[in-house]
Amino acid sequence: MQKIKSNDEIIIIAGKDKGSIGIVTKIVDSKVLVEGLNLAKKHVKPNPNKGVTGGITEIEMPLSISNVAIYNPTTKKADRVGIRTSKNGIKERFFKSNDKSII
């Protein structure tokens, strides 16, 4: 079971966007895409055949998973994730600071 999943609320702990809070949109190997953060400018050449207008656009770049931590809304801080099995035998993730389950 992964400690960080899609749609998790995370906080960036290193890099130019340090301290920013966002939602994970996609996880690829050991990288995460965070909605609206770690933006880079991409120069797009116009292509009338495909209907693409040229210009400078901003795209989200992946962050290393080691530079993000899950955000705990009750403590309003970065937190660590633990994995435990419930009495039903189902694995669940929980915050290590206050032992609450992650929804």
UniProtKB/Swiss-Prot annotation:
GO annotation terms (biological process) = translation
Question: CDD domains from the xrefs?
Answer: KOW_RPL26
| InterPro entries according to UniProt | KOW (IPR005824), Rib_uL2_dom2 (IPR014722), Ribosomal_uL24 (IPR003256), Ribosomal_uL24_CS (IPR005825), Ribosomal_uL24_KOW (IPR041988), Translation_prot_SH3-like_sf (IPR008991)
Q: Which SUPFAM superfamilies match?
A: Translation proteins SH3-like domain
Q: Which GO terms describe its cellular component?
A: ribonucleoprotein complex; ribosome
Please name the GO terms that the record assigns under molecular function.
rRNA binding; structural constituent of ribosome
Pfam families linked: KOW, ribosomal_L24
Keywords, ordered alphabetically = Ribonucleoprotein, Ribosomal protein, RNA-binding, rRNA-binding
Q: Which PANTHER family match?
A: MITOCHONDRIAL RIBOSOMAL PROTEIN L24 (PTHR12903)
Q: What does this protein do?
A: One of two assembly initiator proteins, it binds directly to the 5'-end of the 23S rRNA, where it nucleates assembly of the 50S subunit. One of the proteins that surrounds the polypeptide exit tunnel on the outside of the subunit.
This protein's assembly is summarised as:
Part of the 50S ribosomal subunit.
User: Member of which family?
Assistant: Belongs to the universal ribosomal protein uL24 family.
Name of the protein in question: Large ribosomal subunit protein uL24
Write down the species. Vesicomyosocius okutanii subsp. Calyptogena okutanii (strain HA)
Name of the gene encoding the protein in the UniProt record: rplX
